[in-house]
Amino acid sequence: MSVLSKIMRAGEGKILRKLHRIADQVNSIEEDFVDLSDAELRALTDEYKQRYADGESLDDLLPEAFATVREAAKRVLGQRHYDVQMMGGAALHLGYVAEMKTGEGKTLVGTLPAYLNALSGDGVHLITVNDYLAERDSEMMGRVHKFLGLSVGCILANMTPAQRREQYGCDITYGTNNEFGFDYLRDNMAWSQDELVQRGHNFAVVDEVDSILVDEARTPLIISGPADQATKWYGDFAKLVTRLKKGEAGNTLKGIEETGDYEVDEKKRTVAIHESGVAKVEDWLGIDNLYESVNTPLVGYLNNAIKAKELFKKDKDYVVIDGEVMIVDEHTGRILAGRRYNEGMHQAIEAKEGVDIKDENQTLATITLQNFFRLYNKLSGMTGTAMTEAAEFHQIYKLGVVPIPTNKPMVRKDQSDLIYRTEVAKFDAVVDDIAEKHEKGQPILVGTTSVEKSEYLSQQLSKRGIQHEVLNAKQHDREATIVAQAGRKGAVTVATNMAGRGTDIKLGGNPDDLAEAELRQRGLDPEEHIEEWAAALPAALERAEKAVKAEFEEVKELGGLYVLGTERHESRRIDNQLRGRSGRQGDPGESRFYLSLGDDLMRLFKAQMVERVMSMANVPDDVPIENKMVTRAIASAQSQVETQNFETRKNVLKYDEVLNRQREVIYGERRRVLEGEDLQEQIHHFMDDTIDAYIEAETAEGFAEEWDLDRLWGAFKQLYPVKVTVDELEEAAGDRAGLTAEFISESIKDDIHEQYEQRETQLGSEIMRELERRVVLSVLDRKWREHLYEMDYLQEGIGLRAMAQKDPLVEYQREGFDMFTAMMDGIKEESVGYLFNLEVQVEQQVEEVPVEDEKPSLEKEDAVPAQAGARPEIRAKGLEAPQRPDRLHFSAPTVDGEGGIIEGDFSSDDDEEPVRSEADGLTRAERRKQSKGGRRRKK
């Protein structure tokens, strides 16, 4: 055990003793709750809420609340929480990550802290890895909460904002991490308070916390809209790279010349073009220099085309269905429907596959999962495998990890790895092993790392006449049903990675599923007939349990579930998760991994060394070796990948920390505007700051006689209808030499405030307040969006600062701060300019109509007096709401630390124009191309 691990686990015993004491307290009062009627049990919820309101803490209420939930679960679900589940629930309430092995009933554990923390009325979020689990858990565990009088909601991908608002209003809300994160971002793009759906971030329990906070934390959540980008280049470069040859890097010191037109580093997932490749590309495109600034975008297209050709494999990284490229999640093997890679990568893959190329996207709002979860006042989580990542949980989220003991001792046999020289020999051995175990009836779960390999294995099994189920990205609709029955006698299930995670594999089959199916056949619904369902469930469960009990004994005799891994994963944790499907609740079980030198992990790390060992030992292809050195090499490779990934995540967080502080300021400002805070005073500050900035820029150097006051007054005239003249000020000061910056500033400020009052008199104060709100929101959104674009651009090139002996992070922080300050100044200046110069038409309305429903009128009309209680409708050029593309995409974590992935498409009109600046009619991207010759892209 490393020194760090020992430090991390120092207080473990103390915490476990505390959790044991809590479980004992709950047990000591359990009898008091057994005798209560359903109505009396339900009435306790209101009593607890009142006691909390009267000043008792949730910790004081914990034993009674937990005992209440235990009794309710017994009556509604026919399940009683074990003592270890009580300990797990207490750990979650105290804000720890509870490590609970597979089959220990994590879902049921979640009901305890959820009920207790919901008593405060501030809402509890239970976060799962996919929509299926969120819906299943909210229905099943929701019965317990509803029985006790709490409301339960569930956020699903296809819900409308009104439905989402209703779900967030519930005491307890289930949903996926991406949905919660995107709702937070969407709330911070809302145009009116009525569009907001979330009500704060009080307490979150994250199920499969390692998957969400570790595996998926490398890539930020991104909401993006179409950018202005030519798509013809993708197709041209896709054809062009087929004519380029892959080669190896050269080494001038060793006198090795580079070969081919480009090189590929699979480990780092990067490509580099060689001189010969550059020459060919220049020749084919008819340009003199590929690296001239005007051709910079072409380098990005070329790199993406090579990556699409070499690093992204069909049926492993993505599948093509109905002419659409769909990404496959490396961790779960599921298809990520509607998601897309960022940075032009998806378009390059579409061009490679010859399907329609869709638009590229520009970031509108973004946050990393790490920073999103740090918004919660209290965070906790549960998983079967957390101790390997304890240092990361502590360092990034300040979360301690507590290993909760199992209810029964673990008796699974973990066999040592078998290593073969070739992949074909390995799969032959796998099929032989499956056939042998299948013949005696032992259930088998086979884990593969890609759709391609699961289908290859499926073909081999079919050739041998072995009946089996395949569970991969192409069949995830049926996954829960398949996984639930994977423990039946003679069952063979081939699953891609951790598909079906969250569903227990019970030996002999799952009685819960059978009982539920029987009750639904009788026309009962757990949502509609809560009382009848609760009454009928115990008998149905009893019948189902009898049916599977005999089969359970048979399977137990055969050795339990046999888990067979066909490849080691990059992370030890994912290997442990696969193993953990077997040996649940003290059942017997067995696991083994089969490896070959062709496996991705072996190929990228240490493969040559292992190859030498096998050659020296003269091992035939079909004979496995069990060698300690090879096992150590694998452990070392996994450790390297884990360290590399941890560093990536830490790095992402360091850079996002800069944006995070800026985001807090902007989103805080937005929320104040949305909530109707009076902006009049703030607008006056905007005016003063803008005037000061103008005057300082013109008068910072030289004497008064040298100042170009005509240019300064020209700027004032663009900002507002200035009435004070230079001559008047000179006269008041005696002469030009008597003018001071302070005197000019005071005079202009008095003038601008006076003109603003006149503008308000002309429009009416209520309309002016609404105009202020709209203008500030509109300008703030556009400036923030442009700032995100600039920050993206800055981060892409910041690594090069290291060559100048500068710390890229420090430079990013410094320049990011300068850009943020410039953006804030821009918001002030543009807001003031809009407020004076917008031509406004006002219509009175009783109900609020979205502003974007009609094009703004450019005619100025007389102000209509506002009726009490109704918000005036303002139409003005440049104030269409919202000022962002309607076609939005949602980019969620991917699996290799590459660019984000885009999910969802809330489209209205496909021919939306990019947002254009009032000043020159160009988008920011077009202006950048004019001034800098296009945006650079990272390799």
From Swiss-Prot:
Keyword line: ATP-binding, Cell membrane, Cytoplasm, Membrane, Nucleotide-binding, Protein transport, Translocase, Translocation, Transport
Pfam annotation, one family: SecA_PP_bind
Topological relation to the membrane, as annotated: Peripheral membrane protein
The keyword Coiled coil belongs to this UniProt entry's keyword annotation: no
Gene that specifies this protein: secA1
UniProt record similarity statement: Belongs to the SecA family.
PANTHER family hit by this protein: CHLOROPLAST PROTEIN-TRANSPORTING ATPASE, SECA INNER MEMBRANE COMPONENT OF SEC PROTEIN SECRETION SYSTEM
Single GO MF annotation: ATP binding
One GO process term, biological-process aspect: intracellular protein transmembrane transport
Protein's organism: Streptomyces avermitilis (strain ATCC 31267 / DSM 46492 / JCM 5070 / NBRC 14893 / NCIMB 12804 / NRRL 8165 / MA-4680)
Biased composition (Basic and acidic residues): 852-863, 872-889, 914-925
Biological role: Part of the Sec protein translocase complex. Interacts with the SecYEG preprotein conducting channel. Has a central role in coupling the hydrolysis of ATP to the transfer of proteins into and across the cell membrane, serving as an ATP-driven molecular motor driving the stepwise translocation of polypeptide chains across the membrane.
Sequence ranges of Basic residues compositional bias: 926-939
Subunit structure, interactors included: Monomer and homodimer. Part of the essential Sec protein translocation apparatus which comprises SecA, SecYEG and auxiliary proteins SecDF. Other proteins may also be involved.
Protein name: Protein translocase subunit SecA 1
Positions with a binding annotation for ATP: 85, 103-107, 504
Gene3D superfamilies: Helical scaffold and wing domains of SecA (1.10.3060.10), P-loop containing nucleotide triphosphate hydrolases (3.40.50.300), SecA, preprotein cross-linking domain (3.90.1440.10)
Enzyme Commission identifier(s): 7.4.2.8
Domain of life according to the entry: Bacteria
HAMAP family: SecA
Enzyme class name: translocase
Catalytic reactions on record: ATP + H2O + cellular proteinSide 1 = ADP + phosphate + cellular proteinSide 2
A cellular component annotation (GO) from this entry: cell envelope Sec protein transport complex
Keyword Ribosomal protein: no
Region (Disordered) residue spans: 848-939
